[in-house]
């Protein structure tokens, strides 16, 4: 099943637009569509907060990485400021997604 995002005013795909696509393409009502999208992203967020990786086959992996504390500097004053340790989310695209993106780019370049 193919979904079109060409009707978007901006090139970003939003949660609201995903819910609209579920409504239009699959036939869920608008409330169910919104609830399903919200639940999907809540599951991903909760899993990451708990320290678990999220692996979506054919799309990519979301991982939590702990960054060590390091010295920083205020760019205006030059004052040294310590940057505390923190956890960050990283995303690594799957080979399949990378290939799809490269395939589209190669076709655009060839035209």
Swiss-Prot record:
Highest taxon of the lineage: Bacteria
Cysteine pairs bridged by disulfides in the record: none
Pfam family, one: Bac_DNA_binding
One GO molecular-function entry: DNA binding
InterPro entries hit by this protein: Hist_DNA-bd, Histone-like_DNA-bd_CS, IHF-like_DNA-bd_dom_sf, IHF_alpha
GO cellular component: cytosol
Role this protein plays: This protein is one of the two subunits of integration host factor, a specific DNA-binding protein that functions in genetic recombination as well as in transcriptional and translational control.
Identification of the protein by name: Integration host factor subunit alpha
């Amino acid at each position: 099943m193919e979904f079109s995002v060409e009707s978007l005013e901006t090139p970003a795909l939003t949660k609201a637009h995903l819910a609209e696509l579920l409504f239009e393409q699959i036939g869920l009502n608008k409330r169910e569509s919104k609830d399903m999208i919200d639940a999907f992203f809540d599951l991903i967020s909760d899993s990451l907060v708990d320290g678990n990786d999220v692996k979506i086959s054919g799309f990519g992996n979301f991982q939590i990485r702990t960054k060590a504390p390091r010295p920083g500097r205020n760019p205006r004053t030059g004052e040294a400021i310590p940057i505390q340790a923190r956890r960050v989310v990283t995303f690594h695209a799957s080979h399949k997604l990378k290939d799809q993106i490269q395939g589209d780019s190669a076709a655009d370049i060839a035209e």
